[in-house]
């Protein structure tokens, strides 16, 4: 399985293990208004407006208005009662100065190909070429790398791309490259890299992308809800498939119950989150734990539960293994230090009695633990995820409605009951056709590496690392192809990325915006946005509310092409066009995908209309038949018949499998490990005292829509990405609201606009991830980022030898008022087009 298949699989794990429901059989209620049903098990013909062109996106379904050939306005789909504010920026996604208009090639690469001066990468100087020239160069580089170096030298990567079941860049990239030859695959992802590796060892499944207990059952049964590093309100604005935002209706119900005193919400977070603010500061108990000390807090809670006899012995005996091996560490018999509340107080900044009181409250009533993803994106992030499960096991409420734990509540409308319906297929990255270069000789190097270590592979080829029980020899990468992704937003330590990219012979980027990845590429190919093509998408993710037509809003802009057409033309150059297209064009694929859905529906008793009727008349169909769901209920009711996917079939508080790996940074049971750098008195805090969060943004999806001036006008400060800072920290540095500040550490420096807010604990600052990198010195390492990309500052180390995932939130910085000349932001301007500087040179004329 290559990296693109792994990404698709991980993002869609939420379709599996839904308490006996299959992919095609998820059930759920209408959330906002009662829906009428036609036949007992038929898709409903929803009564919808026809004003505007209907289409979908990561931010929701919209009605698009077109005037004089331009996409000028986006109105929420009439069934979306809680639309995201981000849809206001969608027209800018199509029409903006950073739009990639033509195929372009970096100046020196055009002259010298793989022998070019790679220190010029990032200087933003490009030459416009024809599509035929660009695709010829693409093909010739694939040929050269396969013949000269073999499959161990080529890596492809995709990411969040655009919505649509057919037009997915990851699948198309994977299939096209697989038809040409083998390459290096990647495993894991940047969102949940630590949790998705540790949790299968502990509870037998990834957990992070799965459906959660239905919100109606939580609202009915929970007395205490613990939000542990989870900001539901902010993060549910954008989903993998087109969101319906129905989950916000349950947040409104939760708000009412909290105000009425029926449910108590506890937020464990150094920040007053958007969800916390929405529910009301006066109603939410705030545990402002010092950053990166969540595990000491968890251990102290476990110690209190044990020492005060508040834990569920029967649950531990019947559903878990390994508590006896964990206990000596918890009690201090192993290292002489009991992990009690007094010990944790010194690390966490939380009063010992508050910790003990929290443990008592969690044990007193039905408690639902809602865990986010940000805490596991730290060094040793596996330990926090493991301890969430241990705490829930000690409480003994796993598998009960409104109890237990969950790691995916903030994603894909989790907790919204699913509906019985069809899950459409899409364009798969797999193929049974053998490649042109059927070479599987990786010369002793590993064919799959952890995605968060791909820069390591470039900088340290041949290095052997551990990864989830395996030994990995990093391959000597020479060429990378990026489609539908932006490593400058998702990978850490940008100056290290730049050093790595300089060692590559060729970088190819396929995108619709001039992101930093494109600026540092050699060949840049312009792809369409989802608003320039036709597609199909699920409406609602976990809810599976319906299927929506994604109608083309405007024609492809400038010389942009669909990814499908780009890779079709590439495959034609090595006689695999038919194998890639399977004889179908865009509408042919949509009809095939729809017909597969029709057949799937027949097996489920769900009727879909004929494609032409749907596409030309209905545009949207809605599914019915709600069914409530309780996470882990089947396991609780019969652990023998419904075992977990662990070696024991039970929850593994102690894992012999992990213990046998002999890793010093991830052992047989959860533990506290000091970090390489940590604020509030931790290592490195004397020089860089502020912890930097780089969490999901509020006005974009990762780096998507950062190009939107409409949205930037709503959140930027002095034209910069905002940095949020506590009033005490700001005052001590002479910083006021609106000041341009320099945020820096030994890894780099950025400018940002100060927002002074008491929502952030002293010693904590935040810059949202996804801000576009804007160096003041082109592609030089160490340049000052004029806009404010936090990955200039983050650290590129693995969480541990187990997951080798990102440790973005193990980052310390200092902030000072900037007194230098504030240069104009140029990240959103596109490239410098060089004219008549050089000519296209065929590969045969390039001298080694």
UniProtKB/Swiss-Prot annotation:
Pfam families: Molybdopterin, Molybdopterin_N, Molydop_binding. It is an enzyme of class 1 (oxidoreductase). GO terms for cellular component: outer membrane-bounded periplasmic space; trimethylamine-N-oxide reductase (cytochrome c) complex. Its EC number is 1.7.2.3. GO terms for molecular function: electron transfer activity; molybdenum ion binding; molybdopterin cofactor binding; trimethylamine-N-oxide reductase (cytochrome c) activity. CDD domains: MopB_CT_DMSOR-BSOR-TMAOR, MopB_DMSOR-BSOR-TMAOR. Binds 1 molybdenum-bis(molybdopterin guanine dinucleotide) (Mo-bis-MGD) cofactor per subunit. Gene3D superfamilies: 2.40.40.20, 3.40.50.740, Dimethylsulfoxide Reductase, domain 2, Dimethylsulfoxide Reductase, domain 3. Exported by the Tat system. The position of the signal peptide cleavage has been experimentally proven. InterPro entries: Asp_de-COase-like_dom_sf, BisC, CT_DMSOR/BSOR/TMAOR, Molybdopterin_N, MoPterin_dinucl-bd_dom, Mopterin_OxRdtase, Mopterin_OxRdtase_prok_CS, Prok_Mopterin_Oxidored. It is found in: Periplasm. Mo-bis(molybdopterin guanine dinucleotide) binds at residue 191. It comes from the Bacteria. Its cofactor is Mo-bis(molybdopterin guanine dinucleotide). It catalyses: trimethylamine + 2 Fe(III)-[cytochrome c] + H2O = trimethylamine N-oxide + 2 Fe(II)-[cytochrome c] + 3 H(+). Coiled coil: none annotated. Reduces trimethylamine-N-oxide (TMAO) into trimethylamine; an anaerobic reaction coupled to energy-yielding reactions. Belongs to the prokaryotic molybdopterin-containing oxidoreductase family. NCBIfam families: bisC_fam (TIGR00509), PRK15102.1 (NF011682), torA (TIGR02164). This is Trimethylamine-N-oxide reductase 1. It comes from Escherichia coli (strain K12). The lineage of its organism: Bacteria, Pseudomonadati, Pseudomonadota, Gammaproteobacteria, Enterobacterales. The gene is torA.
């Amino acid at each position: 399985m290559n990296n693109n298949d792994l990404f698709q699989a991980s993002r869609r794990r939420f379709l599996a293990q839904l308490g006996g429901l299959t992919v095609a059989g998820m059930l759920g209620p209408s959330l906002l208004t009662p829906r009428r049903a036609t036949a007992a098990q038929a898709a409903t013909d929803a009564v919808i407006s026809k004003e505007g062109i209907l289409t979908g996106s990561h931010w929701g379904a919209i009605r698009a208005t077109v005037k004089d050939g331009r996409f000028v306005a986006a109105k929420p789909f009439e069934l979306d009662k809680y639309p995201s504010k981000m849809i206001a920026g969608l027209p800018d996604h199509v029409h903006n100065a950073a739009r990639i208009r033509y195929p372009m090639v970096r100046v020196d690469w055009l002259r010298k190909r793989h022998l070019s001066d790679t220190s010029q990468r990032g200087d933003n100087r490009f030459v416009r070429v024809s599509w035929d020239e660009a695709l010829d160069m693409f093909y010739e580089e694939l040929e050269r790398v396969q013949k000269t170096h073999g499959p161990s030298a080529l890596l492809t990567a995709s990411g969040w791309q655009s919505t649509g079941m057919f037009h997915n860049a990851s699948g198309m990239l994977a299939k096209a490259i697989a038809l040409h030859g083998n390459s290096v695959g990647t495993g894991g992802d940047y969102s949940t890299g630590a949790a998705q590796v540790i949790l299968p060892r502990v509870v037998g499944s990834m957990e992070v992308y799965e459906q959660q207990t239905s919100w109606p059952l939580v609202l009915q049964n929970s007395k205490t809800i613990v939000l542990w590093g989870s900001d539901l309100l902010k993060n549910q604005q954008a989903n993998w498939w087109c969101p319906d935002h129905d989950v916000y209706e349950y947040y409104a119900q939760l708000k009412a119950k909290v105000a009425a005193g029926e449910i108590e919400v506890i937020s464990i977070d150094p920040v007053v989150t958007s969800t916390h603010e929405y529910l009301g500061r006066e109603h939410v108990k705030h545990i402002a734990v010092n950053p990166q000390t969540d595990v000491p807090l968890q251990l102290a809670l476990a110690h209190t539960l044990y020492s005060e006899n508040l834990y569920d012995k029967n649950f531990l005996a019947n559903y878990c293994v390994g508590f006896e091996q964990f206990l000596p560490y918890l009690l201090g018999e192993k290292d002489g230090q009991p992990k009690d509340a007094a010990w944790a107080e010194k690390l966490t900044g939380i009063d010992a009695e508050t910790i003990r009181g929290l443990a008592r409250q969690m044990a007193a009533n039905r408690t639902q633990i809602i865990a986010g993803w940000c805490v596991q994106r730290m060094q040793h992030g596996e330990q926090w995820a493991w301890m969430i499960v241990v705490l829930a096991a000690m409480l003994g409420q796993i598998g009960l409605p409104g109890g237990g734990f969950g790691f995916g509540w903030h994603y894909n409308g989790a907790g919204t009951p699913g509906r019985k319906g069809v899950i459409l297929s899409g364009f798969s990255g797999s193929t049974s056709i053998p490649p042109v270069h059927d070479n599987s000789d990786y010369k002793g190097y590993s064919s799959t590496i952890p995605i968060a270590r791909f820069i390591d592979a470039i900088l340290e080829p041949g290095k052997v690392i551990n990864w989830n029980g395996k030994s990995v020899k990093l391959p000597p990468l020479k060429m990378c192809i990026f489609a539908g992704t932006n490593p400058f937003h998702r990978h850490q330590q940008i100056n290290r990325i730049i050093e790595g990219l300089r060692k590559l012979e060729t970088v190819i980027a396929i995108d619709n915006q001039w992101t930093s990845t494109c600026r540092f590429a050699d060949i840049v190919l312009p792809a369409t946005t989802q608003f320039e093509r036709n597609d199909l998408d699920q409406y609602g993710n976990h809810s599976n509310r319906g299927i929506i037509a994604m109608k083309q809003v405007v024609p492809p802009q400038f010389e942009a092409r669909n990814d499908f057409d780009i890779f079709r033309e590439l495959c034609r150059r090595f006689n695999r066009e038919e194998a890639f297209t399977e004889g179908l064009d865009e509408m042919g694929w949509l009809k095939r995908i729809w017909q597969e859905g029709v057949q799937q529906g027949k097996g489920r008793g769900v009727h879909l209309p004929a494609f032409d009727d749907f596409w030309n008349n209905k545009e949207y169909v809605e599914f019915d038949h709600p069914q409530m769901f309780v996470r882990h209920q089947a396991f609780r009711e019969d652990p023998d018949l419904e075992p977990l996917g662990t070696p024991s079939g039970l929850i593994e508080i102690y894992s012999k499998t992990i213990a046998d790996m002999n890793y010093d940074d991830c052992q047989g049971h959860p533990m506290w490990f000091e970090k390489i750098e940590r604020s509030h008195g931790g290592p490195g805090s004397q020089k860089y005292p502020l912890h930097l969060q780089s969490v999901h943004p509020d006005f974009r999806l990762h780096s998507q829509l950062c190009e939107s001036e409409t949205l930037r006008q709503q959140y930027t400060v002095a034209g910069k990405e905002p940095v949020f800072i506590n009033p005490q920290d700001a005052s001590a540095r002479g910083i006021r609201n609106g000041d341009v500040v320099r945020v820096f550490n030994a890894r780099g420096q950025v400018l940002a606009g100060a927002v002074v807010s008491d929502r952030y604990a002293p010693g904590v600052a935040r810059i949202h991830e996804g801000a576009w990198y804007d160096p003041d010195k082109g592609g030089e390492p160490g340049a000052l980022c004029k806009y404010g990309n936090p990955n200039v500052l983050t650290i590129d180390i693995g969480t541990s030898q187990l997951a080798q995932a990102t440790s973005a939130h193990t980052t310390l910085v200092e902030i000072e008022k900037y007194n230098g000349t504030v240069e104009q932001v140029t990240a959103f301007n596109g490239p410098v087009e060089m004219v008549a500087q050089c000519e296209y040179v065929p590969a045969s004329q390039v001298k080694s």
